Amino acid sequence: MARINQLVRKPRRARAKKSDVPALEGCPQRRGVCTRVYTTTPKKPNSALRKVARVRITNGAEVTAYIGGEGHNLQEHSVVLIRGGRVKDLPGVRYHIVRGSLDTAGVSGRRRGRSKYGEKKPKE
C-alpha cells in the first residue's frame, strides 16, 4: 500500500480502456471498399445466413462488417461507410455498414426505424 506522501508526489494512473473498434482509430465512421461480400452462419443456438462483407478501410485495415436490413445491393468494389457495433452471434464481426450512404442503398419499403436503414419517409 502506498503512503499518502507517495500518492501526493505521483498519483495513481487509471488504466487505459481498450477500444472495442480499433480499426476506426477514434473516428465515428470510416470509408472503405468491399473486398468480398458473402453470407455466414451464426454460432449456437441461432441459425441463419447472415450477410457480411470484408472491407478494406482507408487507413489500410481489413475488417468484417455486418450488412443489416432485408436485402442489399453490395458487391465487390462497392464503397461503403463503416460504423462500430458488434454482432453478438457472429464471432469476429465488430463493425456495421451504414445503410443509405455512399454505394449502399437503404432498405426499400421500410416503414419503422427508417433512420437506421437509410430509408426516406414514404409519401402519404
Swiss-Prot record:
Gene3D superfamilies: Nucleic acid-binding proteins. Part of the 30S ribosomal subunit. Contacts proteins S8 and S17. May interact with IF1 in the 30S initiation complex. It holds the Pfam family Ribosom_S12_S23. With S4 and S5 plays an important role in translational accuracy. This is Small ribosomal subunit protein uS12. HAMAP family: Ribosomal_uS12_B. InterPro entries: NA-bd_OB-fold (IPR012340), Ribosomal_uS12 (IPR006032), Ribosomal_uS12_bac (IPR005679). Keywords: Ribonucleoprotein, Ribosomal protein, RNA-binding, rRNA-binding, tRNA-binding. GO terms for cellular component: ribosome; small ribosomal subunit. It comes from the Bacteria. One of its GO terms (molecular function) is structural constituent of ribosome.
